[in-house]
C-alpha cells in the first residue's frame, strides 16, 4: 500500500495550505512517496536490527480491506498544482527517519 514518512505528510499539508488558490484545480489531492511490500520492509528492518524476529499472520478480514484499496495513488495533480515532492523515498524513510527514531526511543 502507498506509504510516506510523517515529515512528508506534514510538509504536504503545510504546502497545500499555503498554495495560492488560483493554482489549485481541485479540492482534494492524493500524495504518496513509496509502495513497499511486507518482504521489502522486513529486509530493511532485519538489516538494521539483525536480532529482530519478524513474523506475521494474515487476518482475512483486514486483508480484504487492504485488498479493496488501490495498489498505488496518482499524485500527479499535487506535484503539478503545488509542487508536492516527498523528501523521503523508501530507503531514506527507513535509514534517515524510521530506524534512527526507533533506535533513539529504545536505546
Task: Name these PLM-found stretches.
Residues 2-107:
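C-terminal substrate-binding subdomain of Rossmann-fold SDR/epimerase-dehydratase oxidoreductases
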Amino acid at each position: 500500500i502507498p506509504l510516506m514518512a510523517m515529515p512528508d505528510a506534514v510538509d504536504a499539508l503545510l504546502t497545500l495550505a499555503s498554495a495560492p488558490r488560483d493554482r489549485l484545480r481541485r479540492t482534494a489531492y492524493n500524495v504518496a512517496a513509496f509502495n513497499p511490500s511486507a518482504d521489502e520492509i522486513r529486509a530493511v528492518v532485519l538489516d538494521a536490527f539483525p536480532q529482530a524476529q519478524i513474523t506475521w499472520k494474515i487476518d482475512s478480514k483486514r486483508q480484504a480491506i487492504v485488498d479493496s484499496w488501490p495498489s498505488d495513488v496518482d499524485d500527479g495533480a499535487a506535484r503539478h498544482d503545488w509542487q508536492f515532492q516527498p523528501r523521503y523515498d523508501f530507503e531514506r524513510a527507513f535509514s534517515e527517519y524510521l530506524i534512527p527514531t526507533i533506535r533513539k526511543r529504545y536505546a
